[in-house]
Amino acid sequence: MWYSIRNNQRMALIKQGYKILAEYRLVQDHLKNIYAIPSYASGLHWFGVIFVHSGIYAGSMFRFSILLPENFPDDTILPTVIFNAAIFHPHICPHSKSLDLGPCFKEWRKDQHHIWHLLRYIQAVFADPEGSICTGKSPSGDLVVLDEVNNLEALNMLAKSRPEYIKRIQELAISSRRHMYDKPMIEDPHYIIVEPYCAERHLRFMEQLKSPSWREATCEDDSPPAELLGHIDSSRQLDEDEANQRGKLQAATTDLQHGARCSVAQ
């Protein structure tokens, strides 16, 4: 009995690890200008960084962490997204630096949601902050704005004094670039490090791309990269993306679970 319980726990951990790895594969495949990777210490703690190239927040670089619940992805509890630095935004708490996921997610559903959905939402709130605080239109045609957000000061300034809001965000962008090359806050081999451009290293890398061995290693998937997703697209495109990603996730999970069974058998 004791051995059976231990074996079941081990199997559950292995399956969870492979599911998280499958999620990481989808993240690599789906988005640009936002990056996330599980930490070396725990698959439930992800490091992330976003480079904003359009909208009010253009020119900013923000680091963040994603904390997954213990029973991810089976738990309905939402993951937690926490930024490393304070960011002035209606959906980001000025004290905890956490992002409100409520406007897009009510609960986590493993058959519908994936980590790349979180990253896409993060891109959306920075690309279109005005759109992220609107819930629809009134019968008269006026936009209906959320009345409960993580940062009421940011909400009021964005709604009533947009020029002042933009000025504040421009200062934030300058500050974020100033800290772009800061040393890692945590000692983890998977922490995302940004380094200044080095011409010599760039030329060396470009030469490597020309080598036959490199082309052979990278020709497995010749599909075009996903375009930058600066905002939530139409429901039709979301449905197409979802169907495509579900197929890839199912294939990846099947292969990885086969590997998990082999590991337990050994």
Curated annotation (Swiss-Prot):
Annotated signal sequence range: none
Region (Disordered): 216-266
The UBC core domain, residue ranges: 15-178
UniProt xrefs under PROSITE patterns: UBC_2 (PS50127)
InterPro entries from the UniProt entry: UBQ-conjugat_E2_core (IPR000608), UBQ-conjugating_enzyme/RWD (IPR016135)
Pfam families documented for this protein: UQ_con
Family (UniProt): Belongs to the ubiquitin-conjugating enzyme family. FTS subfamily.
Protein name: Protein crossbronx-like
Organism field: Drosophila ananassae
Organism lineage: Eukaryota, Metazoa, Ecdysozoa, Arthropoda, Hexapoda
